[in-house]
Amino acid sequence: MVKGIGHAAFNVKDMGRSIAFYENTMGFKKAFSIKRPETGEPWIEYIYAGGDQFIELFYGGTNEIPYSDENIGFFHMCVEVDDILEAWKRIVDTDAPQDDAPKQGVDFNWQCWTHDPDGNKIELMQLSEDGPQMKFVKSLESLE
């Protein structure tokens, strides 16, 4: 049975800069590193994202793909927060990209946007009790 999403993985150009972003701006913690078994060189940095979830950062990214809303494939990652204004303040205070300031979406949830050093779009979302996501989760809880 599926338990959830275990991780999202990204190739990164500058590991130090990426780790600093995910720790300082996003508030995650670096968990551990994995080295290449055949060479002992750094390979993957694991960022703890809460629960059983991680973000994998792979060394050696070189080919940038220009972002477009029309691209097929990865579109953005959403991070759930408990206070959207506090999350936005952290983005501003760390001089991270301020793509979209906090606003309430059509789904009644609060959202703001940034992107990581490699241009991966990140939505931060404070779920509303009136939003379809929370209503669905509550409906599942009532079945237990």
Which residues are covered by each model-predicted region?
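A short, acidic/glycine-rich surface segment
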Residues: 32-33, 41-42, 62-67, 100, ...
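Hydrophobic side chains in well-ordered alpha-helices
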Residues: 18-21, 87-91
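Vicinal oxygen chelate
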Residues: 4-13, 43-49, 65-144, ...
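N-terminal beta-strand motif that seeds the catalytic metal site of vicinal oxygen chelate
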Residues: 1-17, 74-79, 128-144
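Core segments of cupin and vicinal oxygen chelate
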Residues: 2, 9-54
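Short hydrophobic-acidic sequence motifs that mark active-site Asp/Glu residues
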Residues: 54-56, 121
